[in-house]
Amino acid sequence: MDVHDLTRAPPEYLEVVWVTDVCKLVMAVGWLSNYIGMIAKSIKEQTYSMALMPLCCNFAWEFTYFFIYPYKVPMERNIHTLAFLLNCGVMYTAVRYGAREWGHAPLVQRNLPVIFVVCIACWVSAHVAFAEQYGPSLAQAVSGFACQILLSAGGTCQLLCRGHSRGASYKLWLARFMGSFALILPNMLRYKYWRDDHQYIGSPLYIWFLGMFLFLDGSYGFVLWYVRRHEREQVLVAKPKVQ
């Protein structure tokens, strides 16, 4: 799969393509740092960082565009290879420690590995169906946006439902946000200089995706601050008062 075939690119875009390459590297640093940080955080605190359903959707997306519709551009292929391998580590920690977070739901707790397998299989089938319907290039981009929205919403909901910040940190949030935010400028440049092949970037759906990403991921930072403030208050309440 060649997401952005530069042989089709107009000269105006080729003049600024270096900007998109720099942004891709920023994206890679952000997301790879996020994956490494999630693995380390999960092992240290014996939990998992990414919400269950977004994790399965994201892993399925990585799997689909690593094995079934692989990238042809060397830089993108190498970045995606590292991302997939690290995502395997994220998935391992989720399976290894996930049951600790589901004591309130014994059915889920006992069957978590099966739930992960079924969810990943379902999401892979969805990504493949979308790619076959609309073509891998467009499907890769649009389904990637959908993964991001699900991840942003799922992360915020996970914080609210758990009521604690184990598995979460400002560094993980900022790395993820930076990695995704870095792709906005390349999309703007493609829409401005290479519009024929990137009409979807100016569509109402893409604008909605962008707005929801900024709102949901921005909200995550506020919710994390609120949860941590509540944790500090609980610690103070639990401390015995000195007579």
Curated annotation (Swiss-Prot):
- Signal sequence region: none
Enumerate the transmembrane spans: 16-36, 50-70, 79-99, 112-132, 141-161, 172-189, 207-227
Lyase recorded as keyword:
yes
Q: What is its EC number?
A: 4.2.3.-
Its predominant location is membrane
Where in or outside the cell it occurs: the entry states:
Membrane
The Swiss-Prot or TrEMBL record annotates one GO molecular function as: lyase activity
In the record, biological process GO terms are: terpenoid biosynthetic process
Keywords noted in UniProt: Lyase, Membrane, Transmembrane, Transmembrane helix
Broad EC category = lyase
One GO cellular component assignment for this chain's record is: membrane
Q: Does the keyword Lyase apply?
A: yes
Q: In which pathway does it act?
A: Secondary metabolite biosynthesis; terpenoid biosynthesis
Q: How is it used?
A: Diterpenoid pyrones display various biological activities and subglutinol A shows insecticidal and anti-HIV activities.
Record's Pfam families?
Answer: Pyr4-TMTC
Q: How does it sit in the membrane?
A: Multi-pass membrane protein
- General function of this protein: Terpene cyclase; part of the gene cluster that mediates the biosynthesis of the diterpenoid pyrones subglutinols A and B. The first step of the pathway is the synthesis of the alpha-pyrone moiety by the polyketide synthase dpasA via condensation of one acetyl-CoA starter unit with 3 malonyl-CoA units and 2 methylations. The alpha-pyrone is then combined with geranylgeranyl pyrophosphate (GGPP) formed by the GGPP synthase dpasD through the action of the prenyltransferase dpasC to yield a linear alpha-pyrone diterpenoid.
- Describe the family membership recorded for this protein in Swiss-Prot or TrEMBL: Belongs to the paxB family.
Instruction: Supply the name of the protein.
Output: Terpene cyclase dpasB
Provenance organism: Apiospora sacchari (Arthrinium sacchari)
Q: What is the lineage of its organism?
A: Eukaryota, Fungi, Dikarya, Ascomycota, Pezizomycotina
